[in-house]
Amino acid sequence: MERLVIRMPFSHLSTYSLVWVMAAVVLCTAQVQVVTQDEREQLYTPASLKCSLQNAQEALIVTWQKKKAVSPENMVTFSENHGVVIQPAYKDKINITQLGLQNSTITFWNITLEDEGCYMCLFNTFGFGKISGTACLTVYVQPIVSLHYKFSEDHLNITCSATARPAPMVFWKVPRSGIENSTVTLSHPNGTTSVTSILHIKDPKNQVGKEVICQVLHLGTVTDFKQTVNKGYWFSVPLLLSIVSLVILLVLISILLYWKRHRNQDRGELSQGVQKMT
């Protein structure tokens, strides 16, 4: 009696695939992750950047560096053996305010424009080497707004100026008929930008008593600045010239009358003196 034996070939491809899948799972499970968060803070206020090592690996030292064009610059380190060590260039400017080898926080006491940029936190871990994360700090300046108006010869100029960092945007909330708008942008050495918008209103009398609204957009927030145009005094050039000419004429007539009066008085006194002598 013959027996039929079927031999199944061993699949090397399936074995290799299984090995690669298992290796990928292990690597993903063991992958080290550093969690950071970018911050935006106002100029000349404190600011903090945080880093968190999201695994159970043991860190030996934590280093904070500032990213620069050529190479990162060491700022401060922390370890259990040496504590906090701040580089001379950053003394009295920063400190590590959360001491730990898993979670670390640096704080700037009074941020300036030079502090804006990106920073790296490096965890020197046992078995994984240096694991880094990056957090960026953005510095902003709140808008300083000026709103005023001025009557000219035959029109009304309303000016709204906003200075901030980053550059603000200026809008108007007024009727558009008979109104022209011009905008000028100026960058300052301190990093702020001024945006000045001027409304040219051709019929100023119709704007008297009405409210003008200047809207400033900065960092996603719109703020309204309001002002009511009060009655002003404006003259046309011909009218102004006529008034000036009339005033000059009156002054000349007054001088002439004054001169004639004194002349007559002098003649009268002279004639009286002659009569007495005779």
UniProtKB/Swiss-Prot annotation:
Residues 142-232 form the Ig-like C2-type domain. It comes from Homo sapiens (Human). Keywords: Cell membrane, Disulfide bond, Glycoprotein, Immunoglobulin domain, Membrane, Signal, Transmembrane, Transmembrane helix. This is OX-2 membrane glycoprotein. The keyword Transmembrane applies. GO terms for cellular component: axon; cell body; cell surface; membrane; neuron projection; neuronal cell body; plasma membrane. It comes from the Eukaryota. Costimulates T-cell proliferation. May regulate myeloid cell activity in a variety of tissues. SUPFAM superfamilies: Immunoglobulin. It is found in: Cell membrane. CDD domains: IgV_1_MRC-OX-2_like.
